[in-house]
């Protein structure tokens, strides 16, 4: 996985940046994605995630993660051999992640991992709106977290 990680406001330390990078690489292997698959994660604060949520999701509140998948359509040009596929962008609010960790009674690292995996799966076409989709996504999410060693 080719991950671009942006943390302009230094919301996380190097240890947590490393966790994100390793977990994204692990997720890519779990889903058997080509090694040159690209994505980005931008770490933002409460005000910015609320603005993005309001502007693009029409929901005026903070959240932990917002995903913008780059979905293939009929009009897309096919990728040339060896050309990287960009699956999209995640915006993660570590402040909300920390609040969730405290609320749910587990470590910040586990909640950060959960948030990264959850967003990663959304970028790869998984969803949980319909019960039948949730029945696929949530067990896969739990399986990846357990295999990585981030359990409740």
From Swiss-Prot:
Key word Zinc present: yes
Query: Its principal location?
Result: cytoplasm
What enzyme class is recorded for this protein? hydrolase
Q: Which UniProt keywords apply?
A: Cytoplasm, Endonuclease, Hydrolase, Metal-binding, Nuclease, Ribosome biogenesis, rRNA processing, Zinc
| GO cellular component terms, semicolon-separated | cytoplasm
Instruction: Please name the PROSITE patterns in this protein's record.
Output: UPF0054
Record carries keyword Membrane: no
Sorted alphabetically, which NCBIfam families does this protein's record hold? rRNA maturation RNase YbeY
Q: Which family does it belong to?
A: Belongs to the endoribonuclease YbeY family.
Q: What is this protein called?
A: Endoribonuclease YbeY
- Provenance organism: Lacticaseibacillus casei (strain BL23) (Lactobacillus casei)
Q: What is the lineage of its organism?
A: Bacteria, Bacillati, Bacillota, Bacilli, Lactobacillales
């Amino acid at each position: 996985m080719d991950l671009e990680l942006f943390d302009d406001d230094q919301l996380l330390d190097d240890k947590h940046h490393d966790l994100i990078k390793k977990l994204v690489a692990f997720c890519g292997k779990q889903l058997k994605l080509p090694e040159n698959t690209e994505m980005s994660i931008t770490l933002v604060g409460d005000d910015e995630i609320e603005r993005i949520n309001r502007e693009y999701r029409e929901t005026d509140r903070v959240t932990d993660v917002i995903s913008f998948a780059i979905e293939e359509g009929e009009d897309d040009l096919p990728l040339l051999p060896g050309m990287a596929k960009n699956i999209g962008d995640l915006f993660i609010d570590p402040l909300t992640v920390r609040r969730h960790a405290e609320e749910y009674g587990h470590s910040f690292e586990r909640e950060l991992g959960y948030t990264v995996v959850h967003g990663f799966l959304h970028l790869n076409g998984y969803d949980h709106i319909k019960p039948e989709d949730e029945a696929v996504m949530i067990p896969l999410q739990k399986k990846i977290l357990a295999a990585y060693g981030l359990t409740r």
